[in-house]
Amino acid sequence: MDSQLVLSLKLNPSFTPLSPLFPFTPCSSFSPSLRFSSCYSRRLYSPVTVYAAKKLSHKISSEFDDRINGALSPDADSRFLDRQKALEAAMNDINSSFGKGSVTRLGSAGGALVETFSSGILTLDLALGGGLPKGRVVEIYGPESSGKTTLALHAIAEVQKLGGNAMLVDAEHAFDPAYSKALGVDVENLIVCQPDNGEMALETADRMCRSGAVDLICVDSVSALTPRAEIEGEIGMQQMGLQARLMSQALRKMSGNASKAGCTLIFLNQIRYKIGVYYGNPEVTSGGIALKFFASVRLEIRSAGKIKSSKGDEDIGLRARVRVQKSKVSRPYKQAEFEIMFGEGVSKLGCVLDCAEIMEVVVKKGSWYSYEDQRLGQGREKALQHLRENPALQDEIEKKVRLLMLDGEVHRSTPLMSSSSSSASHREEEEEDSLDDFQ
């Protein structure tokens, strides 16, 4: 009964039959149907085997065509319904055990964009894709006198302007109410905690976060969060990894609580140097590496130079450069520059002009700045002076810049489950209504 038969299977790679009747290699060209052709040869010892193979190939081909056309058999439809019922039962069981909303479908929960609020620095908002994210952990680190506290105080002032509550955990015991007031902080309503140790600082911040009544908590700084065991011990005692373990344990609790409450946690951090590093960057932030993982946004701030007075004999400020080293809510590795004037804070007018130039709202040709058909001045200082003398024009330019930011970067943010179940259309109306709050 030996006969040389030419048999080949042309098979779609997404559906491969697992059967001993098909010991053949598929052809290089695929087709939804199975058929005999002269691509490969195989010796078969029984015509019954050939008949069975042909019959099974037609059956598989018809089933595959049904799958492509979306036609499900009653048995398959029944299995699908049973799986959906089992899924709903499991979700209901989890919600009854751990509380409503513990597990849900993203679409039914009202998927929304990442909610942000202004950092108070327009160029930084542009680099962040709209601002600082709500309900997330943010780390700001850099060398001494680089503007870390100033940046945090501007964020606190913006939250208070929008009617929110802010808290400052002053672990360094160096809070300056006069300087904070000059930056726009409502010091009368600012919640301040000057803790005795790191455990007290983080526990206080966690309790305020869980209350749901605080919108922003700033810890200044991680390096000053001294564990209780280190305070009670003698100076010079070796306490290995106490602060790192403290931060790791606290962040495991606080990150989830902050997300549920919609409270942003800002941690200011200092830079240390690793010993024995000859190649690469020896700089490292204090408090272990847990904060690097839990932070949704990490900002590195450094001084880019001093600002001299008009006579050139006195330093009146510094130019800060911020680099977005990590961001889970926008594109990372962007940079922002702004001027920090001593005793006054960030130059908001300079930020408006810089952003307007970047987004081509204001056009610079040569040394001249112009807005639409109106010339603002020759040189940066003249343009700033013109905007300073025309507040209405300044507000108009800033409003256009923020509208472009809302239409661009913010709408490309990562979706998540919002704590408030507002629809996308309602959010767009709120964004338009809240433009005046940015002023």
Swiss-Prot record:
One BP term from GO: DNA repair
GO molecular function: ATP binding; ATP hydrolysis activity; ATP-dependent DNA damage sensor activity; single-stranded DNA binding
Domain of life per record: Eukaryota
Binding site for ATP: 142-149
InterPro entries cross-referenced by the UniProt entry: AAA+_ATPase, DNA_recomb/repair_RecA, DNA_recomb/repair_RecA_CS, P-loop_NTPase, RecA-like_C, RecA-like_N, RecA_ATP-bd, RecA_C_sf
Chain intervals with Acidic residues compositional bias: 429-439
UniProt entry keywords in alphabetical sequence: ATP-binding, Chloroplast, DNA damage, DNA recombination, DNA-binding, Nucleotide-binding, Plastid, Transit peptide
Gene Ontology cellular-component terms listed: chloroplast stroma
Transit peptide: 1-52
Location in or out of the cell: Plastid, Chloroplast stroma
Disulfide bridge partners, by residue number: none
Transmembrane regions: none
Region (Disordered): 413-439
Listed SMART domains: AAA
Signal peptide: none
NCBIfam families per record: tigrfam_recA (TIGR02012)
Family in the record: Belongs to the RecA family.
Function description: Involved in recombination ability and DNA strand transfer activity.
PANTHER family (alphabetical): MITOCHONDRIAL DNA REPAIR PROTEIN RECA HOMOLOG-RELATED (PTHR45900:SF1), RECA (PTHR45900)
Protein name: DNA repair protein recA homolog 1, chloroplastic
Species whose genome carries this gene: Arabidopsis thaliana
Lineage: Eukaryota, Viridiplantae, Streptophyta, Embryophyta, Tracheophyta
